[in-house]
Amino acid sequence: MTQTDHPHDNVVPTPAQRIGGALIGDDRFGEFDWHDPWPTYDRMRTEAPIWQNPEGITLLTRFADCEAVLRDPRFSSSNDHADPPRVLAADDPRSLMEGGSAPLIFLDPPDHTRLRKLVSKAFTPRSIERLRPRVQQLVDGILDRAAHEGGLDVVADLGYELPVVVICELLGVPLADRPQFAGWSSDASRLLDDDLTPDELNRGVVAAINFAGYFEALFADRRLAPRDDMVSALLAVEEQGDRLREDELRSIVVLLFIAGHETTMNLIGNGTYALLRSPEQRERWRHDPSLDASAVEELLRFDGPVHLTGRIPVEDIELNGHLFPRGKSVVTLLAAANRDPARFEDPAHLDVARPDNHQLSFSQGIHYCLGAALARLEGQIAVGSLIRRFPDLELAEEPQYRDHFVLRGLKSLRVTV
C-alpha cells in the first residue's frame, strides 16, 4: 500500500471528522477526512493560510505562522484571556474538577515559569537517559511475546503497554496499581476534545478525579517514606525556599501521566504505520541504527501524535501581516505546519534521513513538551527494535484512527511478524 492509499471512503463521519469539519467551517477546502486530512490542509495553506472560521476562530496552517505564535508570549494558553469568557454550565461535570491548580500547559508566566523551573529539576535529560536500559528490556520482552505468538497489536501491546509501565516506574506507582492507569489516561485525555457524548464527558471527569485521589494518597505515603522515584523528587524539590503546593503537584503528575502515555502511544502507532506504507524507508532505517534520532523526528513530523494546539492573544497583535484580535482563539494546526512545502522539501514523502526535520509536534516556546526527551527515547527504542527484530513485518488488517481530534492516533495496528 502506498502512502496516499486510504481505503476509508463512504464511512459514516466520526466525531473527529465532525469536529474537524466544524472547526474549518467551510467546504471550499474539500470534505474533511480525518483518516487523510492532508488534502484539506494543503488547500487551506494555499488558499487561506490564515483562515477565520464562522465562529471567529483563526486557524493557521503555515509552519512560519504556527511557530511564530507558539513562540510569542503575547499568545496565552490560558482560557482566562478568552473574550467572551468561557464559563462552564452549572450542570457540566467538569465543574467538579475546578478549584485546584490549572495544568501546566494552560498556565502563563509567572506561574508557568515558577512551576516549570521546579518540575524541570526532577525531569532532567540525564534522568531520562538512565531509563534507556530499562526501556530496551521492556521492549525486548514485548517483542519476545510477539515472536512466540506470530504477531502483535503495535498500539495495544507496544504503544499502550510500554509508556504506562515506564511512567508508572518513573513516578513510583506500585505494580499492582498500574492496570487501572491506562484506562484512566484514555478517558481523561478525551476532555481535550469537544463534541463529547455525556457518557464520554462523565468518564473523563471520573478518570481525572480518580487520578487526583490516587496521587494524593501516594504523596502522603512518599512524605512518610521517600523513595528513588519522581514523586519523591517532586516532593523534595525546592528553589530558593519555594516548593510545589499539593494541588500543583497533583496537577503536574496527572498531566505527566496523560501526556506521556497518550502521545508516546500515538508516536509508536502512527510511526510504525507510516513505515509499513514506506517499505524503502523502513529498510533504510533498519540497516542504519545511526538514523534512530533522525527517523523518530521524521515520524513526529510526518504524522505526529498531537494534531493541534490553541492560543489566545492577550492584546491585539499584528504578526506576519495579520491582525489577531485580543481574546479570540487561534488554533495552530501542527499537523498541517509539519507538511508545509515552504519549510520541508517534498513534505508528503517520508524520509528517515531528512537533514532538517525540526518539527512542531512538541510545540515551541515556553510550552515546549517537558516529556519530549522521554517520548523520543521510547519511540527510538520501540519502533527501531520492532523493525530490526521483524524484517518481514506486515499489516494484518487496515487500521482506523481513534475519534480524538487533538491527539491523533490509531485504534489498533495489528501486524504479523
Residue ranges and their predicted role:
Residues 1-417:
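Cytochrome P450
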